[in-house]
Amino acid sequence: MMQGNTCHRMSFHPGRGCPRGRGGHGARPSAPSFRPQNLRLLHPQQPPVQYQYEPPSAPSTTFSNSPAPNFLPPRPDFVPFPPPMPPSAQGPLPPCPIRPPFPNHQMRHPFPVPPCFPPMPPPMPCPNNPPVPGAPPGQGTFPFMMPPPSMPHPPPPPVMPQQVNYQYPPGYSHHNFPPPSFNSFQNNPSSFLPSANNSSSPHFRHLPPYPLPKAPSERRSPERLKHYDDHRHRDHSHGRGERHRSLDRRERGRSPDRRRQDSRYRSDYDRGRTPSRHRSYERSRERERERHRHRDNRRSPSLERSYKKEYKRSGRSYGLSVVPEPAGCTPELPGEIIKNTDSWAPPLEIVNHRSPSREKKRARWEEEKDRWSDNQSSGKDKNYTSIKEKEPEETMPDKNEEEEEELLKPVWIRCTHSENYYSSDPMDQVGDSTVVGTSRLRDLYDKFEEELGSRQEKAKAARPPWEPPKTKLDEDLESSSESECESDEDSTCSSSSDSEVFDVIAEIKRKKAHPDRLHDELWYNDPGQMNDGPLCKCSAKARRTGIRHSIYPGEEAIKPCRPMTNNAGRLFHYRITVSPPTNFLTDRPTVIEYDDHEYIFEGFSMFAHAPLTNIPLCKVIRFNIDYTIHFIEEMMPENFCVKGLELFSLFLFRDILELYDWNLKGPLFEDSPPCCPRFHFMPRFVRFLPDGGKEVLSMHQILLYLLRCSKALVPEEEIANMLQWEELEWQKYAEECKGMIVTNPGTKPSSVRIDQLDREQFNPDVITFPIIVHFGIRPAQLSYAGDPQYQKLWKSYVKLRHLLANSPKVKQTDKQKLAQREEALQKIRQKNTMRREVTVELSSQGFWKTGIRSDVCQHAMMLPVLTHHIRYHQCLMHLDKLIGYTFQDRCLLQLAMTHPSHHLNFGMNPDHARNSLSNCGIRQPKYGDRKVHHMHMRKKGINTLINIMSRLGQDDPTPSRINHNERLEFLGDAVVEFLTSVHLYYLFPSLEEGGLATYRTAIVQNQHLAMLAKKLELDRFMLYAHGPDLCRESDLRHAMANCFEALIGAVYLEGSLEEAKQLFGRLLFNDPDLREVWLNYPLHPLQLQEPNTDRQLIETSPVLQKLTEFEEAIGVIFTHVRLLARAFTLRTVGFNHLTLGHNQRMEFLGDSIMQLVATEYLFIHFPDHHEGHLTLLRSSLVNNRTQAKVAEELGMQEYAITNDKTKRPVALRTKTLADLLESFIAALYIDKDLEYVHTFMNVCFFPRLKEFILNQDWNDPKSQLQQCCLTLRTEGKEPDIPLYKTLQTVGPSHARTYTVAVYFKGERIGCGKGPSIQQAEMGAAMDALEKYNFPQMAHQKRFIERKYRQELKEMRWEREHQEREPDETEDIKK
């Protein structure tokens, strides 16, 4: 029996996700607690005080002298809690040590809070272990274990009398337990410290009857309180009925050696429980109902009451361990679910185990429903009002984040009894395991594999084979596998480039003709196939590489685990949770009853062969909702073996869900020697313990449950009897089956969810099986969404609607045409053959129960996404080695590798996932806003352009929600150009601007960057769509060049400019000498002449003396002032020894510097702008007009150095002023550094962005006029565009004036003049926009006016104030 009880303690192993004790018999240190390395400590925790507890020799009185009014006096055979303890010195050592003694034990970091364990159970009465004197005769075993002792035995602490129903063991602090279903175990650190008020014992303390009010930071938000209240009301009547089961049901999941009269498992009355019909029970229920709203401050410390209500606290409708929804999301409360349903009914039990008192409980449910509605209407407003008044700060996002972090903290867990299926004897262990399977477990595995594991294969083998007819695509694939795809420009790596090769209709008909198909409207999965054809149409060469083919660089085969052990030393355990909980909380979760407790499915445990360190959270969009998949390192449940996990995985993922294309080994290792899957999964059926821990159901109990449930849905021999059942009895059975997954081995698909079960007999002469009704979803390829006619009509409808919205006058005929198209679309949607929702009716003959419900399948479909995410980030660590830089922000590296065509759908064959979700997932998932897919991704259309470009910049750096690498490519392009320009400028001091530009073009062109990307093997790490987008080599090389620029931008963004320079230099030159020359360039020639400073020359140079005035004006003192002089030297000036040349080379460098600084600013402060939008903003910021305006405001024209001897003021052209500013930027960078340039542009350039955005200066007049004209196009005709004609040319050749007119639809709408044709066209377009009433232009003005009314007022006031200042100055002078 002691061996059986060893499953209730966790042992720790260093460096792994499971605990494992080391050491010999006798006194050993306290069990080390586990804390994952990648979790931060939320609150400072004090280490627990180690103590040795010697239980008293005689049992103490469990009840106080004055019994509690809510309970009956204790019965003579009542089992006290805690059970009496024998003295440690009297009893012999147990035959099996508490933890197996392993050498070289290493202590691990503790949990944030060490778990509290009840005391050691007394030894079993057996011939070798006599009963303890003084113990009551009915005393049995208790399933808890105490941590091993660590010090010599001190005198036992005296037991202090308390006025409570039960006495707590010293291992528990006497505190009120939090609701275990929503909060992780988190004690106050002071609860583990010696109490100052307790002089009798230094190891425990007594708290006041009610705890002090919580701090504001620890209170729950009103939404969470409502969540608790609604959930508690909903399942209020379930906690009591679970105890009143028939005897055979209570004994069902238990080993025979534990079913004895003297064990702890006895009837309800033997436990001292109040009878169900006693009036004190009703009184206690009323008190609990009034008190439960304030249960954080008042909760009975009775442990028995906690056990009685633990199932209600956890919630029957919670089938997954979930975290709260993030800030900004509306949580889906159980109370809201109750209010929205027509008929309220509690969750039903599964597998046809019905309580004999269901009729009485139904009356109580109805009564509870009425009381709930009364309480809700009377007390909700007042209660929530008071809460919100007291705690307004709880609505802040940081509070929600704190609650989420607390929920994600690991909790201590334990396993249920091993029941002789596992042995934890250290002499039986193999390798680094802590548990090894016994012969009894081996027999269970053989039975499971025989009855369930091979059932599908046997059924398929019994059916006649079917060879589908070959199509043109099959023949083409066979030919392409023989002749490999060449890498020239015209070659293709996909056979889908020719549309005539593949006939979708023929492929769909072929799948419909399968003889084993279960129903015409149920779609099934075939390996490597989608619903409309093969998944991969790539050539044999292309299939050997790429993440899209599930080939992750750096992966190696894993040595197989030992099947009959838990391999605790080499596996890392993680608990998987999903947030928000929408669509993962079901009203009929999968529940397993064992040992008079109900274990609810909460998700999956994942066992990895390597620690998942430095891997970000997995985010995925499903049901139009952004989900986050968390994997939290936790203590490992010990009672499992790897073979049991694999048997369950094959049963669920292969036989039930039919995920044939989900490969956890990798295609490269399929033909290699046997290797282990990279992850093992274990379903978590848990019950919450009163002290914040969890009890996880052992794996063998799950397999036994599946074997028990494996029986016919409607047995043939009982069908006549079932048809004679009363209507109520049949409804009970049908309700139990609703949401259950049933399987018909050998069919396609094999498994389906039951939504209704009908027994109507249409032919009185023939008895037919009941009908299974399943509500499914037709694949998009076969519904109206995939119909070519519907798509064409939809496009024409949207186009016409847009034209009418922008038309100045809408004709009645156009309105009728739009209504006709809308009606035609509606008719197509309502066709039975085109509707997405279908109703499937199947005969229940041949269907078998599986024991699982849709919640298990719902969570199982998240696992392929998570495994793909983890494997991809593990292979990115291999990329870190290739580039020589380790990213701290792993999401940034993933973003750099993500092509715009990539979409993370399901982590595997998308049609397989959709089919399995439709067949076995929840019936009616709740969908979010469909805009979530393109909310931050859409960039087409004039309205989208105006909407995005009207957004002002963020004050603080904000992360972008655009999840591809185009923005990083925009930044990386500027970084590459800057690095190239700087190095060329310094390495070739005598080369003019034209030569420098030629060299730079050769380095930064895409063809060369693709070669550098090939050195890093970026094509093996890139994420892009598995389709024809990048099949051609030219397209792939272009994408690789963009990916390389994005990678450089990511290195610059996270690392520094120096890191980007080193990476670029390593890739440019393989030769170390050339690389050294490139990286260590010389100083500027003016700096080489005067290494320290040249300001001593100011005294003898009038030119330099004048430049000191400019230095004082801008507040920057140059170390080498001759650099500033060269920046202001125009190219008309000949060579001189002061400047050693003119400013044309500096202009080349300054342009690249300004591009980089402006690009970085826009990238950081405009997170919602795509690459094209950022380019428009940068063009409005870094252009000749803006640069000339800044140069003029700074007075640079006064300091320009020319060859004019008269020293008369000369009006410089716009281009010349812009060149002066760019040269000054280069001089500032050479003399100082890039930080000075950032500051200069922060002051002189970036504040102008607001004005540019409000005035829409980012859009030049010609582009704006063309956009307005295109909105007025007529359907079915070529769009009219504005035409420009030169009317007149006046003046000499060096000073001509051009007159240009613009025409639209044959009508002149504007005219303009300018010194060049381009400027004259701009003037004509501006004149047309002002005179012609374009609806689009009016819409843009109204949009900006409504959005920024206050900003526009302030801007106009500032402009008027600036215009009045010169006039006031002139008046003062007069």
UniProtKB/Swiss-Prot annotation:
Instruction: Give, from the UniProt record, the effect of changing residue 538 to A.
Output: Impairs protein folding and stability
Annotated positions of the Phosphoserine modification: 355, 373
Where Mg(2+) 1 binds, per the record, is at 969, 1042, 1045
- Cytoplasm in keyword set: yes
Annotated segments matching region Disordered: 1-95, 130-406, 452-497
Q: Which InterPro entries match?
A: dsRBD_dom, RNase_III, RNase_III_dom, RNAse_III_DSRM__animal, RNase_III_sf
Catalyses: Endonucleolytic cleavage to 5'-phosphomonoester
Q: Where is this chain's protein located in or outside the cell?
A: Nucleus; Nucleus, Nucleolus; Cytoplasm
Q: Where is the composition biased (Low complexity)?
A: 182-202
Q: How is it modified after translation?
A: Degraded by autophagy in response to neuronal activity in motor neurons.
User: What keyword terms does UniProt attach to this protein?
Assistant: Cytoplasm, Endonuclease, Hydrolase, Magnesium, Manganese, Metal-binding, Nuclease, Nucleus, Phosphoprotein, Repeat, Ribosome biogenesis, RNA-binding, RNA-mediated gene silencing
Q: Identify the residues that bind Zn(2+) 1.
A: 536, 538, 549, 1026
Coiled coil location: none
Acidic residues composition-biased segments: 475-491
Q: What is the effect of changing residue 676 to A?
A: Impairs protein folding and stability
- Cofactor, how bound (note): Each RNase III domain binds at least one Mg(2+) or Mn(2+) ion.
Any GO MF annotation of the entry: ribonuclease III activity
According to the record, the segments passing through the membrane are: none
What protein family does this chain belong to?
Belongs to the ribonuclease III family.
Tell me what this protein is called: Ribonuclease 3
The organism named in the record is: Homo sapiens (Human)
